[in-house]
Amino acid sequence: MESSAKRKMDPDNPDEGPSSKVPRPETPVTKATTFLQTMLRKEVNSQLSLGDPLFPELAEESLKTFEQVTEDCNENPEKDVLTELGDILAQAVNHAGIDSSSTGPTLTTHSCSVSSAPLNKPTPTSVAVTNTPLPGASATPELSPRKKPRKTTRPFKVIIKPPVPPAPIMLPLIKQEDIKPEPDFTIQYRNKIIDTAGCIVISDSEEEQGEEVETRGATASSPSTGSGTPRVTSPTHPLSQMNHPPLPDPLGRPDEDSSSSSSSSCSSASDSESESEEMKCSSGGGASVTSSHHGRGGFGGAASSSLLSCGHQSSGGASTGPRKKKSKRISELDNEKVRNIMKDKNTPFCTPNVQTRRGRVKIDEVSRMFRHTNRSLEYKNLPFMIPSMHQVLEEAIKVCKTMQVNNKGIQIIYTRNHEVKNEVDQVRCRLGSMCNLALSTPFLMEHTMPVTHPPDVAQRTADACNDGVKAVWNLKELHTHQLCPRSSDYRNMIIHAATPVDLLGALNLCLPLMQKFPKQVMVRIFSTNQGGFMLPIYETAAKAYAVGQFEKPTETPPEDLDTLSLAIEAAIQDLRNKSQ
């Protein structure tokens, strides 16, 4: 060993100059340290092209593991281990799709691992990138100027994990034999199959146009027990295949638009009557048909359903029909109309061919007045003679002199004017605080068609009255008509008093209304038979009033007389003093 020998120039590190020191023997630790330092310097001076699309893809036969690269470098001294290893690393990173923006100081992968172990004992972890093409050589900084060199002095570990391809979605194959033809759409009603051409598809109003109407399949498949409930079986055809012309309703449902609502603001019965008729159906029994359709077609190409309904829903399930507009509140007074009862009993009404127009109706136009309509006979003023206040008071005084008013009463009739109604309500409130009164709620009067009886009918009736009770009982003179009854829009109210005191007191509250509204309010006295009071609780008060007129008033105690005389004397004395 010569002491003056100089170390040769390191081709991998040209910055290092010749040294006069004697080279030390290389140990495995020294070799590993030198390898790491050289690798770090190589990384600083060079640049890895990560994810550059300029790398060409190689065939799978050119892929090499870490051991193959080491053996190849040992056989060929011209090849550098670091260069070959760097090419493999760059190729793996490029195949994994990692670019410089996503790389940090530490990259993680399962295919390549670089450690500080000696070169003669390679680690068991090797570079094995399966099904990953390797690029040829690492790119230079000129080819990818966006890459920046990594400046670090620590050993690093690069682990690259190739992307996992998405798992293919396996769709089951449908055999042609498995596709069965869909059954036809049938409706069975009362053990009879109804042709679908007679069905009317009813959808909701503006809210559900263009949308699908969803109905539960349980409603369609549930068995119907009633005789009037139809049964639906296997509805599968789309609505686009059921474009049949609409036919009349086989159940005889009345037309909802045939009747007009009343324009009277006070006669709420006429306004709400047309809406109540829409909610009713014929008495032949309710029926509901629900059919759901699968597949494309119908409204907007989506799965849709159709609904045919009339009457009430079956008690087996919930209502699945289209929502209807809520009707106005119908009072008990409106439901008890004679016209509504006649309609419920299926009484036929004759519809005269008359011209309907606004304005007054003459007395002789009976057919126009009693046509089949829901409107009331409207009157701005009362259509009959109104008695004067003096006549009403004279009749009341004549009744009160008899000391019994159980067969008399007060009737108040007023129009639908808003101001009149407010005044009448105030009087009703005051009447409710009085004693011994029976008050009725306001009610309507319904009128039928007028007719003039021939002379022979009048003669038979007069003869029966002359013959006595038996002849009148056997008299059968019932003259009917087929026109619709009409109700007037004015209101009626009855007041029944127990004693003359209460009758005159109630009359004093009602007569000012007649004086304030002479054409809109009428008060009159009516008579009944010798029946009792509305309730027997008033009989004691009525008898006490009759007996009280003949009883002498109780005498005033002496002390009260003395006190009264003293008060009179004191008052006289005061007057004398003032006069002086």
Curated annotation (Swiss-Prot):
SUMO-interacting motif 1/SIM3 (motif): residue ranges: 501-504
Motif (SUMO-interacting motif 1/SIM1): 199-202
Domain of life: Viruses
Keyword Metal-binding: yes
Composition bias, Basic and acidic residues: 1-11
Molecular-function GO term, any one: metal ion binding
Start-end of Polar residues biased regions: 99-133
Annotated stretches, region: Disordered: 1-30, 99-161, 206-336
Keywords recorded for this protein, A-Z: Activator, DNA-binding, Early protein, G0/G1 host cell cycle checkpoint dysregulation by virus, G1/S host cell cycle checkpoint dysregulation by virus, Host nucleus, Host-virus interaction, Isopeptide bond, Metal-binding, Modulation of host cell cycle by virus, Phosphoprotein, Transcription, Transcription regulation, Ubl conjugation
One GO process term, biological-process aspect: regulation of DNA-templated transcription
GO cellular component: host cell nucleus
The record's note on its domains: The SUMO-interacting motif (SIM) is required for efficient transactivation function.
Entry function: Stimulates viral early and late gene expression and thus play a crucial role in the regulation of productive infection. Selectively drives host RNA Pol II transcription initiation at a subset of viral early-late and late promoters without substantially affecting Pol II transcription of expressed host genes. Mechanistically, forms a repressive complex at the major immediate-early promoter region involving direct association with host nucleosomes and TBP. Concerning activation, stimulates transcription by binding nearby, but not within, core promoter regions.
Protein's name according to its UniProt entry: Viral transcription factor IE2
Gene that encodes it: UL122
